[in-house]
């Protein structure tokens, strides 16, 4: 796929993104997970051929979209980046495909701008509006000091092990994280908590495909995904065999088949 590498500046950060135009007005926008970059969706691009305009990015603080020395990652700034990108291309309706952090961002965009989204595909991400147990709330409060206790190389290695089953996926994650500073990674993880709000009455107003690796060991994702799907008539769940947290990389064949089928569903 012929992707054009471009940048735009917003809130002190040069955001790098990749764009492919088509004759269609339909857009699909890929949103990667924390610590990763746009390359994690390489195996999904062939699904879309010439039928869609495609956008991928390196979210601020990730990949080529480096933060300035005195900057701190903010989930709210990332939302603003996304909306600026949509404004730049006058996007009025898009399919969002988000993995982990990207899925949290996609949920928040649908919550705030429902008319901007036609469908969501959420890969191995937690529920923004889910109810947390007391132990989960405690772990969130303790996570920052725990992260800082870990040597950076140990944190990189353990994060990579949690993300993938396939050795190539683990190597990719290690490569991405090695380009970040420990403080920046921790800032990203802590900022993600700002999108969590308990609202058990909330239901998605658009069709949503939930994909989860059967071996996902990250947070509470595997535990909550089935009840999440059961509670929302707009959700369709598929567990992905032989896949960890980065299910779209561990088992792209199964993920691509599920996405292609979902795209044709009214």
Predicted ranges, named:
Residues 131-133, 149-203:
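Conserved alpha/beta-hydrolase catalytic His-Asp/Glu region
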Residues 13-67:
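Conserved HGGG/HGGXW glycine-rich cap/lid loop of the alpha/beta-hydrolase fold
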Residues 1-29, 51-52, 92, 260-266:
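Alpha/beta-hydrolase fold catalytic core
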Residues 98, 102, 106:
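Gly/Ala-rich beta-loop-alpha elbow adjacent to hydrolase catalytic centers
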Residues 107-111, 118-147:
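Flexible "cap/lid" loop of the alpha/beta hydrolase fold
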Residues 209-243:
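Conserved loop-alpha-helix segment in the C-terminal half of the alpha/beta-hydrolase fold
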Residues 243-252, 256:
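Catalytic histidine-centered segment of alpha/beta-hydrolase-like enzymes
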Residues 55-97, 257:
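Active-site loop/oxyanion-hole signature of alpha/beta-hydrolase fold enzymes
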